[in-house]
Amino acid sequence: MVSKRLSHQTGHRRKFLAIIDETPECRRAVEYASRRAKNTSGALTLLYIIDSSEFQNFLGVGDIMRAEAHERAYATLAQIKTEVCDIVGIEPETIICEGQKADQIARVINDDQDIAVLILAAGASIDGPGPLVQSIASKGSAFSIPVTIIPDGLSDEDIDSVT
């Protein structure tokens, strides 16, 4: 069960959660979420999830792989955070965690009662909207917050007009 949202209570701000990864659609989700947060006096949380299954079965090498994954996560988050600050003028919160994406997203939402909307972006692949969107859609009942999926074809102007 997901905890009660506090984002509309005194002393709290509504947070928009964007998932950060190496996919091109990730940037569209961040663009929408950051503009929505700014235009509604909310906040932005950027979540990078490291798939720990990639290095669990390698003894000494697993620690090196984990450290490299964390370095990539920090670098990616730092770059996106800088872009958001420069372009939109807000400073996002950043979180790095390890595990299965849908489970970690649910945990972060449950732990932070100010997170009120999960923002994802659909990919342009002929195979569908992307593995993250498909995974979240299959676990939709696990989230007690709205999930907004940004279509691939939205231009910057379109995003500006709907945020």
PLM region descriptions:
Residues 28-32, 107-108, 135:
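A short acidic, amphipathic alpha-helical/loop segment
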Residues 96-104:
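Charged docking surfaces used in two-component/phosphorelay signaling
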